[in-house]
């Protein structure tokens, strides 16, 4: 399918990589302030410093939990995690386990902000990992072929692999459920992440439930087409409602027989990862009307010069 810049919908892959490899808790706090990846830092091979901004160009200068950082889609937190990883390579390896070819992922720190062109199919396929206990299962479109006598002459076989440790995956599911904010008429567990790109040209939303994963992109066929403001052009306003309405309509359709008792899989025993972050939240930072935030990845088209 057509590939477009995915924006903040890519951030959960950066978070997942850090939690999976470094064992960082969603409750660990990070400073919402300018972060610079400089020449000589890690294996980024930059030739000049890179200091991306939040969408508003403002910083709270407050300590935010990882969980809150994802909900508020703070670019600063995502870049901090990328710097912590020391290289884009761990993230590229992670998404490769989720079905996205490494050839599509630039070897650049700006992938932390979603400076990547991918298709809705590729993104939705990768997000199924979160809804499936960290297991990526290759999407298939044709289940089987039968001849005119009803005899099966072809049956598809979908490969699968464990991309995320179950404990790390459940932490991500918990964070995505927290991040979703407004959920419309959808009943039962749901999580998700919005995405908005430069000049408000692309709006994304990836939604996960125990039964179904739905992804959508909204934008113009030509990249120069954009909405005139972030308020109108953010994924939370133009892409997310489509997914919520679609899932709600499926739940209301008796023919679908939606399983309202289904829950995201939680590994048995102790997770070893703290998820209850209430004691760490800063009560002085207000939510907007629907509890959502969208920090679009500004200036990511102005890439730093990279070495060979």
Task: Please tell me what each predicted stretch does.
Residues 1-10, 115-118, 235:
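Gly/Ser-rich catalytic serine loop of serine hydrolases
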Residues 4-32, 69, 126-130, 172, ...:
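Active-site SXXK
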Residues 20-21, 60, 74-77, 118, ...:
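Short, glycine-/Ser/Thr-/acidic-enriched flexible segments
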Residues 24-32, 136-140, 181-190, 250-264:
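Acidic/polar loop patches that form or flank catalytic/metal-binding clefts of enzymes
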Residues 24-91, 136, 148-178:
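Conserved catalytic neighborhood of penicillin-recognizing serine enzymes
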Residues 34, 38-40, 45, 49-53, ...:
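Soluble, non-transmembrane domains of envelope/secretory-pathway proteins that act on or interact
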Residues 97-153, 157, 163, 191-199, ...:
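Active-site-proximal helix/loop microenvironment
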Residues 170-197:
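Active-site Gly/Thr loop motif
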């Amino acid at each position: 399918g057509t590939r477009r810049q995915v924006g903040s919908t890519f951030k959960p892959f950066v978070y997942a990589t850090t939690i999976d490899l470094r064992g960082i808790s969603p409750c660990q706090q990070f400073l919402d302030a300018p972060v610079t990846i400089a020449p000589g830092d890690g294996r980024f091979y930059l030739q000049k410093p890179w200091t991306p901004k939040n969408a508003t160009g403002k910083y709270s200068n407050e300590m935010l939990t990882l969980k809150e950082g994802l909900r508020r889609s703070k670019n600063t937190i995502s870049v901090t995690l990328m710097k912590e990883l020391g290289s884009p390579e761990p993230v590229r390896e992670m998404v490769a386990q989720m079905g996205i070819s490494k050839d599509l992922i630039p070897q650049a720190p700006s992938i932390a902000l979603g400076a990547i062109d991918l298709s809705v199919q590729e993104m939705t396929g990768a997000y199924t990992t979160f809804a499936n206990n960290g297991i990526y299962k290759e999407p298939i479109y044709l289940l089987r072929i039968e001849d005119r006598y009803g005899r099966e002459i072809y049956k598809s076989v979908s490969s699968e692999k464990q991309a995320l440790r179950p404990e790390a995956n459940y932490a991500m599911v918990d964070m995505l459920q927290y991040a979703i904010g407004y959920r419309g008429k959808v009943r039962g567990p749901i999580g998700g992440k919005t995405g908005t790109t430069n000049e408000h040209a692309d709006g994304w939303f990836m939604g996960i439930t125990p039964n179904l994963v739905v992804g959508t992109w909204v934008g113009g066929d030509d990249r120069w087409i954009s909405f005139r403001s972030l308020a109108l052009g953010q994924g939370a306003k133009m892409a997310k409602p489509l997914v919520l309405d679609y899932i709600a309509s499926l739940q209301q359709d008796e023919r679908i027989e939606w399983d309202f008792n289904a829950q995201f899989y939680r590994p048995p025993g102790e997770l070893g990862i703290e998820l209850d972050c209430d004691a760490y939240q800063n009560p002085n930072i207000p939510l907007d009307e629907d509890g959502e935030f969208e920090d679009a990845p500004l200036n990511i088209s102005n890439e730093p010069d990279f070495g060979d």
